[in-house]
Every structure is written in C-alpha cells, then in structure tokens.
C-alpha cells in the first residue's frame, strides 16, 4: 500500500490547466413497460431527470473534487445550455472557467434516456456541431490558453472531437507547455496520434488504441509492442491504455510495462468514468506520484465513479475510503456526516454485495463489555454500522448528569475501533427510524436482551435479515462505573 495520505495532502497545492470540449449532460430516468401504438418503439414513463456538466467540464469538476485548482478553457454557444454551463461552472470554487463564446454553433448537449429499473441506456439524443472551431474562435482559444501555462503544474487536453482541440490549438499548447517544462496529458479522440506529438502521456481506451495502431490490443504484449511504436513516432514518455474491467496498462518509453487490474465492483453507469481517470492521473502526477502510484489512484477513482449514476465526480473522501481499508481510516472519516453521506456509503457497500450489520447504544464510557458485543457484531457481518444516541437522547434515557462524554467524543472512540466501520448519531430515544433507513442484513444486541425486546427486530426479520444476540460480560456497565467513580471522588 502506498502513502495515499502523503500524496493527497499535496493535491490542494496543484493547479491543472484543462482544455477541451464542454458538454451539457442530461439523464432522463423512467420505466419502460409498453410499446407505442404509433410505432414499434418503447415508451418511457419519465420519473425524474438530472442535468450535469459533461465532457471536459466533468474532467474539471473531478479535478476540483480532489481538492486541486483547475483553470478550464472551453467553448460554449450563446444558447440556454451555454448559459446553464457558465452559471454552474462559475459556482465551482476551485474551477476558474475561461469559456469562449461561439455564436455559430450550439453548445454540445447530450440527453440520455435510461431505464431506471435496469440502469440501462435506451437512447441518446445529441445536439452538436463537431466541426473544428473557426479561425477566429481558434485564435481566441489560443489567446486564452497560453497566458495560463505559467500558472499550471500540469496540462490536460480532453479531446471529444467537438471542435475545441483543433490541430493548431493542440500544437501551440503542447509546444508552449514543453518550452516551459510543463507535462501534458492527452485523452485523445483522433485516431491520428501524430497530432499529439510531444505530449507526455496519451490515455486512449482500448478501442481508440486499436483503431489508431491497427493492432488487436487484446493482451499486454500486443499493447506494449504497438505502444512503443507510437511513442517512437510521437516523442511521448508513456502511453496508457484503459480497458474497463480489464484494468489499465501503461507502457513507458523506458522501463517495464505496468498493469493495474480493475477493482471488482458492481458497475452502475460508465458515463464519465474516463474523465475521472484522466483527472485523477493529472492531479496525482502533478503532486509528485510515480507512474504506478498514479495508476493505482486513478483505478480506485474509476471504481468509485462507475458505482454512481450519470456523470459523476469522485471526492477526495470517497477516493480515500476506496484506497484505504476501513481499519486504516481516521476515526473522523468513520462518522457519518449526514443522511446523504450515510446513504452513499450504504449504497456502495450493497453494490459490492457486502453484508451490513447494525447495533446501537449510548456507549458513554466504553468498557470490555461493549468491546465484546461490538467485536461479535462485526464477526456476524462484512460492515458494522453503530447507531449512537445523541447527547439529548442519553439525557432523556439516563437522567441528568449523563452523558459523561459528549456525542462527538463518544463517536470518535467508537470509530477508532477496528470492529466499527461507521458511526451514525441519532436524536430519537430508539433507533427504529435509523434501522428502517439502513435496512441491515444483521441486527445485533447484547444477550441481556430477549429477542422480543430488540428494537427493530420485526423490520429486519420481515426483510429476510437475522437478529443476533451476543453473550455479555457480567460485571461491566457504564452506570456501575459512574457510581464507582463518584464514590471515589
């Protein structure tokens, strides 16, 4: 395991200059249960829709989500989609958008119709003019980009072949960046890799690579042979071929081929996962990572991204949780910050097929009896969520003078235990609402309760879950410890 904390601490000091094709991504979700009487076409009953910044704009948002600063240069039309994108990007604190207006073209917009039940894309509608930018707009792009190069730690070109990255823009940016000693990463669209000559790193997917090199690209040997020929022609330092569930293969100009397998995860939506990969690579390399560390970081980010719906960003906290096992996480990261935070973590665990357990209590003064129950609870599941009574709740249940420790202190002590994967503070006197939200596979309590006394047992068993009672250690209780301490005061 590499020092992720050491690397990620440097992310906030980096500035990435990102240039590429900006898009508006819209996802229309609904159910499909019938065929139209007017034509042999499915009818989607729309239930909700989402609009996100897409294309190179999604790259910029992923850079910012990791805590780095992004100077973003792109094109937008003078239309409603362009206004929406400008407004959204202007609200991103770590993104400095420099958008050139092109009244002659619409803002690229993609609308995807998705079956909500099956998470299947049924249809995509595109509004775009993929022709290269006009000479006037091309010059405006170059004039916007070149003055920003001295401020950047690394340059990222995100090419979707929608008109921004013309041959001239690419050439001028790469030449100027190399003159300043700046590394350039290119996520290419053109099959003519020669137009990216001088770039530090090219990151095609397997299909793009196979088309450009006319190779099979079906094993590491064929990828390496074709990649080294490409680097000889384009004067690059390395070429990375992303291969979805087959991982990533990086071929450096000198040295051994590096292959990083993909994480085993349930794929919900691959839209924008490539954006997440190149954004993470750029930030990691700018922060001083070597090739292998940057690849492993990007692979983990991709695993988080494909577990989300739509065009998604991956935050630094999410990436940290993916890379580091729960036992290595700092205590504060094992405390749910909101219901959304709780829901996201539960969703990620369920998508991995993990068995979720739940127990609860006040845990005012942690003692061996608590530890025995928590350890037993963790043994009965893959991830243990501990519901913790808030200060107000403890006072109502235990009386004045309690709790001895406030809820934050109690949560941090619990979170420091290896047996505990997540702590959730709740305000009610019982955890019934929390259990209903979590829907655990396993509900655990100490053996001083009978099955009928366990709050939420009906909910859990009705959904096919189980209730586990752990034998307690006699002679340990917080109340008795408080009394003994008071007697000695």
UniProtKB/Swiss-Prot annotation:
Binding positions for ATP per the UniProt entry: 205-208
The reaction(s) this protein catalyses: D-glycero-beta-D-manno-heptose 7-phosphate + ATP = D-glycero-beta-D-manno-heptose 1,7-bisphosphate + ADP + H(+); D-glycero-beta-D-manno-heptose 1-phosphate + ATP + H(+) = ADP-D-glycero-beta-D-manno-heptose + diphosphate
A biological-process GO annotation: ADP-L-glycero-beta-D-manno-heptose biosynthetic process
Annotated region (Ribokinase), positions in chain: 1-330
Keywords carried by this UniProt record: ATP-binding, Carbohydrate metabolism, Kinase, Multifunctional enzyme, Nucleotide-binding, Nucleotidyltransferase, Transferase
E.C. numbers: 2.7.1.167, 2.7.7.70
Any one GO cellular component localisation term in the record: cytosol
Pathway: Nucleotide-sugar biosynthesis; ADP-L-glycero-beta-D-manno-heptose biosynthesis; ADP-L-glycero-beta-D-manno-heptose from D-glycero-beta-D-manno-heptose 7-phosphate: step 1/4; Nucleotide-sugar biosynthesis; ADP-L-glycero-beta-D-manno-heptose biosynthesis; ADP-L-glycero-beta-D-manno-heptose from D-glycero-beta-D-manno-heptose 7-phosphate: step 3/4
Family matches, as Pfam families: CTP_transf_like, PfkB
Role summary: Catalyzes the ADP transfer from ATP to D-glycero-beta-D-manno-heptose 1-phosphate, yielding ADP-D-glycero-beta-D-manno-heptose.
Subunit record text: Homodimer.
Name the UniProt record assigns to this protein: Bifunctional protein HldE
Organism of this sequence: Nitrobacter hamburgensis (strain DSM 10229 / NCIMB 13809 / X14)
Gene designation per UniProt: hldE
């Amino acid at each position: 395991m590499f020092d992720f904390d050491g690397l990620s601490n440097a992310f906030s000091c980096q500035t990435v200059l990102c240039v590429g094709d900006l898009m508006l991504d819209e996802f229309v979700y609904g159910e499909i249960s019938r065929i139209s009487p007017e034509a042999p076409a499915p009818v989607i009953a729309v239930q909700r829709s989402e609009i996100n910044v897409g294309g190179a704009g999604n790259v910029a948002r992923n850079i910012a989500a990791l805590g780095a600063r992004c100077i973003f240069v792109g094109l937008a039309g003078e239309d409603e989609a362009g206004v929406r994108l400008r407004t959204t990007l202007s609200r991103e604190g770590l993104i400095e958008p420099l958008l050139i207006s092109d009244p002659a073209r619409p803002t690229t917009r993609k609308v995807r119709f998705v079956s909500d039940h099956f998470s299947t894309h049924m249809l995509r509608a595109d509004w775009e003019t993929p022709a290269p930018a006009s000479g006037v707009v091309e010059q405006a792009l170059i004039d916007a980009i070149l003055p920003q190069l001295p401020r950047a730690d690394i340059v990222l070109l995100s090419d979707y072949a929608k008109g921004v990255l013309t041959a001239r823009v690419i050439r001028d940016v790469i030449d100027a960046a190399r003159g300043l000693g700046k590394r350039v990463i290119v996520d290419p669209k053109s099959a003519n890799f020669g137009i990216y000559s001088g770039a530090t790193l090219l990151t095609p997917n397997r299909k793009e690579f196979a088309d450009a090199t006319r190779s099979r690209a079906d094993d590491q040997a064929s990828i390496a042979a074709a990649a080294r020929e490409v680097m000889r022609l384009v004067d690059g330092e390395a070429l990375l071929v992303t291969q979805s569930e087959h991982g990533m293969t990086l071929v450096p100009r000198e040295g051994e081929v590096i292959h990083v397998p993909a994480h085993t995860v349930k794929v919900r939506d691959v839209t924008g996962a490539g954006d997440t990969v190149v954004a993470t690579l750029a930030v990691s390399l700018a922060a001083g990572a070597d090739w292998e560390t940057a690849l492993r970081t990007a692979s983990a980010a991709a695993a988080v991204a494909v577990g989300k719906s739509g065009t998604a960003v991956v935050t630094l906290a999410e990436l940290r949780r993916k890379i580091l096992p729960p036992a290595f996480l700092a205590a504060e990261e094992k405390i749910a910050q909101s219901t959304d935070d709780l829901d996201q973590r539960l969703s990620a665990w369920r998508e991995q097929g993990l068995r979720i357990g739940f127990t609860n209590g006040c845990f005012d003064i942690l003692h061996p009896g608590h530890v025995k129950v928590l350890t037993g609870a963790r043994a009965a599941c893959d991830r243990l969520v501990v519901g913790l009574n808030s200060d107000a709740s403890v006072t109502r249940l235990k009386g004045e003078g309690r709790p001895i420790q406030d809820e934050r202190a109690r949560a941090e002590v619990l979170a420091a235990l290896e047996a505990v994967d997540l702590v959730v503070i709740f305000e009610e006197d019982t955890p019934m609402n929390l259990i209903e939200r979590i829907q655990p596979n396993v509900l655990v309590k100490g053996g001083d309760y009978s099955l009928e006394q366990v709050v939420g047992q009906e909910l859990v068993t009705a959904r096919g879950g189980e209730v586990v009672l752990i034998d307690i250690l006699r002679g340990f209780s917080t109340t008795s410890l408080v009394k003994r301490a008071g007697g000695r005061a």
